[in-house]
């Protein structure tokens, strides 16, 4: 059944639709009983998605409430042991809220996430190694278990970078490894940020330290405040900055960094000295300007071709760095 396309909505209208749909979904899923598989969205996952949306909207109270709901309803706990250092490939781990369980005939082989990330398979991940910003790596404490996610000593590191070891195949022969879409740790970090934004530094530190004690037993945060630098590399020493740093480390290679860059309105600088080959650096785009339209995708031409209520002269997003 064909339906006529609508005209371009405002951002406000889009978010009204998103939040309305999520609220309806959370209510319905809450009444639907226990889900049958980890790949299915349940009430906790829907609450986690709502928390993600609320961060972008800067609706801090909703983000806090949704993150706390996700934590309380998920039955998950902050991961330790192999749930952290085992390759991020197991949908049954106690910290996983939502994931796709990959079996051999669904692996995708070359066209898969772990092929893209895991250099030990000898394919794409080996020819274009994924490496962390060395400045970010330096933020890890001496006893932080997440240091195992990167290998500064690998002889195959490009340009003295630190290759990732966080994401590994579960079975190299079968090309399998589960895809994790949401972990409970993200909800702790979201609750910490939202609390900080609401001027509840004590509550923010409680959530942050609850997570970090499972990563580095020597870690304790006593910081306060919400100041952020113009660039991600500009340091203010605030509590909010510390939460964002730990969010970058904990969720590295997983969810949402591009959304965080946009919503935090921080530019960034990437150089070869930070651990990447020059050929991998972004060229021709002012990455220090978080408001650049270079970060905004254009609407596909097919949408204009098939929708009489869309006008490319009025409804298309600006192209390039146009303000």
Positions of predicted regions on the chain:
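Acidic/polar-rich alpha-helix caps and helix-coil junctions
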Residues: 1-114, 139-323
């Amino acid at each position: 059944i064909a339906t006529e396309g609508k005209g371009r909505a405002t951002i406000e209208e889009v978010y009204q639709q998103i939040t309305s749909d999520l609220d309806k979904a959370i209510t319905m899923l809450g009444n639907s009983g226990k889900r049958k598989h980890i790949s299915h969205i349940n009430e906790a996952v829907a609450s986690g998605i709502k928390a993600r949306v609320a961060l972008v909207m800067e609706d801090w109270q909703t983000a806090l409430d949704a993150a706390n709901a996700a934590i309380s309803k998920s039955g998950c706990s902050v991961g330790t042991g192999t749930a952290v250092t085992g390759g991020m490939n197991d949908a049954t781990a106690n910290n996983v809220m939502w994931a796709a369980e990959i079996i051999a005939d669904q692996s995708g082989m070359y066209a898969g996430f772990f092929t893209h990330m895991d250099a030990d398979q000898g394919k794409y991940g080996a020819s274009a190694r994924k490496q962390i910003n060395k400045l970010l790596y330096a933020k890890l404490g001496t006893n932080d278990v997440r240091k195992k996610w990167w290998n500064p000593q690998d002889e195959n590191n490009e340009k003295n970078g630190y290759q990732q070891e966080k994401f590994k195949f579960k079975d190299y022969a079968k090309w399998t490894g589960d895809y994790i879409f949401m972990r409970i740790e993200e909800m702790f970090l979201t609750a910490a940020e939202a609390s900080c934004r609401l001027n509840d530094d004590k509550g923010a530190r409680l959530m942050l330290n609850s997570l970090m004690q499972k990563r580095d037993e020597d870690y304790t945060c006593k910081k306060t405040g919400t100041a952020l630098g113009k660039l991600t590399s500009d340091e203010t020493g605030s509590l909010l900055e510390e939460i964002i740093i730990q969010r970058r480390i904990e969720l590295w290679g997983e969810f949402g960094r591009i959304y965080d860059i946009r919503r935090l309105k921080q530019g960034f600088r990437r150089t070869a000295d930070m651990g990447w080959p020059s050929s991998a650096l972004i060229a021709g785009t002012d990455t220090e300007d978080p408001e650049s339209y270079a970060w905004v995708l254009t609407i596909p031409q097919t949408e204009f071709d098939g929708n009489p209520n869309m006008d490319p002269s009025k409804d298309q997003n600006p192209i390039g760095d146009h303000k």
